[in-house]
């Protein structure tokens, strides 16, 4: 699952109170259409999205020029990470815990999406100084999509099943050269123990010498959209460092670690040692 924080400061007493949901309820209560319209209709509508898209090229610059395999772990209904990786990745796999999100991803891959990603593509292209149109960027990315996976970072195996494949010849690897997971791990749970489990699951999918790209929000306890408030783990930077160390991941620049943060939104890249 992915998510950012949406605040409402109207103070109107008559406004209906959001339904409060546990993190585990993402599976059945997450509305991909409401989520995309709240946070991704235009990249400029959400500060967290602006920050992620602005800093993402600097993170991706640290990847090899060509990446054999990428897994977008807990993508929700979003495709901005595959689009951003379209010139480096050779094979992209995407995934989520919620069936509705997986259906949304499949619809986008098959060019049947109801959501218009052109505004986000324009934002990415401006940062990249690319002359490609949104349609060109998306079509190039679609050709790289190999499978959509059902995943659960709190169970073993993490990859529960393959729900869509480009063709019958596609073999989903056990591990990937790059695993990206943005607005996912801390939103998948509500306790520190569960967060550590989620990080362990993510790192277990990375090849030796491979790379983790992680992004999220520090110090958030909930996020809300579409009349629902989802609880999440209140993440601290110390939790990030401790969990990476525990799973054999780089935590210093010399090892292959970079951490960028602005307004409690963070992105990091960490090499598997």
UniProtKB/Swiss-Prot annotation:
Catalytic reactions on record: nicotinamide + S-adenosyl-L-methionine = 1-methylnicotinamide + S-adenosyl-L-homocysteine
GO terms under biological process: methylation
Alphabetized Pfam families for the sequence: NNMT_PNMT_TEMT
Signal sequence bounds: none
Gene Ontology CC: cytosol; striated muscle dense body; striated muscle myosin thick filament
UniProt note: phenotype after gene disruption: Suppressed lifespan extension when exposed to nicotinic acid and nicotinamide. Reduced reactive oxygen species levels when exposed to nicotinic acid.
Transcription in keyword set: no
EC number(s) recorded for this UniProt protein: 2.1.1.1
Entries under InterPro entries matching the protein: NNMT_TEMT_trans (IPR000940), SAM-dependent_MTases_sf (IPR029063)
List of residues binding S-adenosyl-L-methionine: 35, 40, 74-75, 80, 96, 101, 152-153
Domain of life from the UniProt record: Eukaryota
Primary role: Catalyzes the N-methylation of nicotinamide and other pyridines to form pyridinium ions. Involved in regulation of lifespan extension downstream of the sirtuin sir-2.1, probably through its role in nicotinic acid metabolism.
Name of the protein described by the UniProt record: Nicotinamide N-methyltransferase
The entry's keywords: Methyltransferase, S-adenosyl-L-methionine, Transferase
UniProt keyword Ligase, yes or no: no
Family of the protein in this entry: Belongs to the class I-like SAM-binding methyltransferase superfamily. NNMT/PNMT/TEMT family.
Recorded name of the encoding gene: anmt-1
GO MF annotations in UniProt: N-methyltransferase activity; nicotinamide N-methyltransferase activity
């Amino acid at each position: 699952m992915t998510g950012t924080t949406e605040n409402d400061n109207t103070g109107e007493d008559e406004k209906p109170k959001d339904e409060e949901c546990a993190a585990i309820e993402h599976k059945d209560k997450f509305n991909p259409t409401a989520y995309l319209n709240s946070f991704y209709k235009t990249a400029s509508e959400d500060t967290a999205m602006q920050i992620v898209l602005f800093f993402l090229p600097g993170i991706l610059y640290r990847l090899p020029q060509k990446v054999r395999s990428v897994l977008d772990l807990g993508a929700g209904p979003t495709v901005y990470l595959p689009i951003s990786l379209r010139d480096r990745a050779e094979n992209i796999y995407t995934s989520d815990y919620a069936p509705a999100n997986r259906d949304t991803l499949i619809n986008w891959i098959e060019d049947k999406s109801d959501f218009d990603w052109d505004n986000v593509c324009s934002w990415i292209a401006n940062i990249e100084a690319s002359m490609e149109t949104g349609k060109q960027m998306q079509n190039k990315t679609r050709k790289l999509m190999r499978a959509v996976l059902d995943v659960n970072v709190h169970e073993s195996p993490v990859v529960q099943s393959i729900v869509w494949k480009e063709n019958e010849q596609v073999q989903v690897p056990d591990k990937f050269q790059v695993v990206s997971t943005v607005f996912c791990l801390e939103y998948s749970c509500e306790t520190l123990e569960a967060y550590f489990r989620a990080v362990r699951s993510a790192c277990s999918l990375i090849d030796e010498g491979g790379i983790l790209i992680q992004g999220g929000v520090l110090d958030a306890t909930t996020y809300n959209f579409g009349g629902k408030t989802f609880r999440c783990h209140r993440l601290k930077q110390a939790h990030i460092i401790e969990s990476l160390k525990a799973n054999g991941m780089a935590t210093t620049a010399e090892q292959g670690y970079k951490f960028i943060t602005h307004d409690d939104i963070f992105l990091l890249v960490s090499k598997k040692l």
